[in-house]
Amino acid sequence: MNKIRKGDEVIVITGKDKGKRGVVLSVGEGKVIVEGINLVKKHVKPNPMKGTTGGVEAKTMPLQISNVALVDANGKASRVGIKVEGDKKIRFLKTTGAELSA
């Protein structure tokens, strides 16, 4: 069970974007893509087949999953725990104890 999932609000805890918040767009093997964070400029060639004009585009690059943490109700970074109730696993915030939606 992943502790960070698509749609979660996270805060960056290390790196050049430290302190910035965003929503997780996708989760991969040890990496997450967060909306509007870790932007890089990529040079793109014009391609009439794809409809691109070319030039310099800003692209969101993946971050290590260890460099982000979920945001609690107080706006602070929180670790995530997993507890088992019956046969279901439930994620919860370690700082407040609040349960997260599936």
Swiss-Prot record:
One GO cellular-component annotation of the UniProt record comes to: ribonucleoprotein complex
Q: GO annotations under biological process?
A: translation
Q: Disulphide bridges in this chain?
A: none
Q: Which InterPro entries match?
A: KOW, Rib_uL2_dom2, Ribosomal_uL24, Ribosomal_uL24_CS, Ribosomal_uL24_KOW, Translation_prot_SH3-like_sf
| Assembly | Part of the 50S ribosomal subunit.
Q: Which family is it part of? A: Belongs to the universal ribosomal protein uL24 family.
State what this protein does.
One of two assembly initiator proteins, it binds directly to the 5'-end of the 23S rRNA, where it nucleates assembly of the 50S subunit. One of the proteins that surrounds the polypeptide exit tunnel on the outside of the subunit.
**Protein name, UniProt field:** Large ribosomal subunit protein uL24
Task: Tell me the organism.
Answer: Paraburkholderia xenovorans (strain LB400)
Give the gene that encodes this protein.
rplX
